[in-house]
Amino acid sequence: MKSGIHPEYVTTQVNCGCGNSFTTRSTRTSGQITVEICSNCHPFYTGKQKILDTGGRVARFEARYGRRKK
């Protein structure tokens, strides 16, 4: 491997909008990253995600192609 071509890999503090913070490693030289959503407040990870049948698309698909057999 060539020397001197790889970026410096430093410890970085990640701060979320919900107040959660954690430490990781990154090539970002400032040592700080601010994010809006993390795994503590994202609906997918918190279990608050809702799957909506928008406009009957699932029902229309099932009517065309039939229900999937389990």
Swiss-Prot record:
Any idea what job this protein has?
Answer: Binds the 23S rRNA.
Report the NCBIfam families cross-referenced here.
Answer: L31, PRK00019.1, PRK00528.1
Concerning its family, UniProt says: Belongs to the bacterial ribosomal protein bL31 family. Type A subfamily.
- Share what the entry says about its subunit structure, partners included: Part of the 50S ribosomal subunit.
What biological processes does GO assign it? Answer: translation
| Molecular-function GO term, any one | rRNA binding
Record-linked Gene3D superfamilies: Ribosomal protein L31 (4.10.830.30)
- Transmembrane residue ranges: none
Protein species of origin = Saccharopolyspora erythraea (strain ATCC 11635 / DSM 40517 / JCM 4748 / NBRC 13426 / NCIMB 8594 / NRRL 2338)
Its domain of life reads Bacteria
Q: Tell me any Pfam family this protein matches.
A: Ribosomal_L31
- Whichever gene encodes this chain, its name is rpmE
What is written in the cofactor note of this entry? Binds 1 zinc ion per subunit.
Can you say what this protein is called? Large ribosomal subunit protein bL31
Q: Which positions in this protein are listed as binding Zn(2+)?
A: C16, C18, C38, C41
Which cofactors are named for this entry?
Zn(2+)
Alphabetic keyword roster: Metal-binding, Ribonucleoprotein, Ribosomal protein, RNA-binding, rRNA-binding, Zinc
